[in-house]
Amino acid sequence: IDGTERVLALDENTGEVLWSHTWRTSYRMLMASYAIGPRATPTVDDDRVYVLGATGILLCLDVESGAVRWQRDYARDYGTSVPTWGITSAPLVDGARLIAVVGAESDGMVLAFDKYTGDEQWRSVKVAGEMGYSQLVIYDAGGVRQLIVWHASALVSLDPDTGNIYWEQPVDVGAGMAIATPVKGGDYLLVSQLYNGSTMMRLNPDRPTATILWQGQSRNPDQPEGLHATIGSPIIIDDFLYGLGVNGEIRGLDAKSGARIWEDIEMNAEARAQWGVVRWGTAFMVRQGDRYFMNSDEGNLIIARFTPSGYEELSRTSLIEPTASAGFGATRLYDRLVNWSHPAYANRHIVHRNDREIIRASLAAADYQ
């Protein structure tokens, strides 16, 4: 299956298309029902924007014109095996470097490029399986900056300056589905997945090491305990963990032990009434003061609070129509419609998209009085 991918630059206030850039690619490596275009969010850095296609076409473009400054092809240049559901991890700008999950055979799961030229600066982590789908993130812990990488075999901490490994913890990831971003709260570091639930690490506050605090014991996402977050990343507040399980249930857990303290199924009540089971339930959560903006896969913008006592929904509005099908394999095209695109927040507005449109809506209270 051949396709055309593109990036658009729009005027923030009017939505006018300022420029676009397209490139040809082949989706033959992907499951056919997922041959639907790029997944990774564009990364803007000064006068450059970095974009990544679903098959590993990485481009550095000029922000003003869309002109190509440099380009790499993961499969052609590095021997990358494109995973079943496409390449999703957006490159991360760190100083003069651009760091990316590349899966370069056989010793370059992660590569650092000169962000101005595209020249390779370092590579790290042996490729022992699929690259996964999780986003790179840098956290301060143990007196250093740690680049956290979650791929389909392990959770790894690297020195972002050199690529040297600080620590590495093997994690059994079902079907290569390392998707949600690793989440830090205090000395806690969490990853969560569909089949094996959550793994909580304790970060050493004095040096760059980590140990397992607790780990989910069940491969069954329908089990009543723990948290099997699949796409949307959970959150950690003090000594408590909150997240959306694969069946659309919101759960609160004790971060120290992993024990469930409450469950709420009302957020997806409408979809649950229509479909029975909200498989692949997803919401993207962004903190705003003592509350969270939540974008549900039904296209709703929800404002809510999470406490050890439960989930408190403050407001909800239908923001955008879900247009993509959830699920797995051939049956995906017959499942409920979802929106798995993460929105952007800027200048008291939210910008969101589906397969058909891009919208911008005000979040300013004064606009609704």
State where each predicted segment sits:
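Noncatalytic, solvent-exposed loop/strand surfaces
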Residues: 1-369
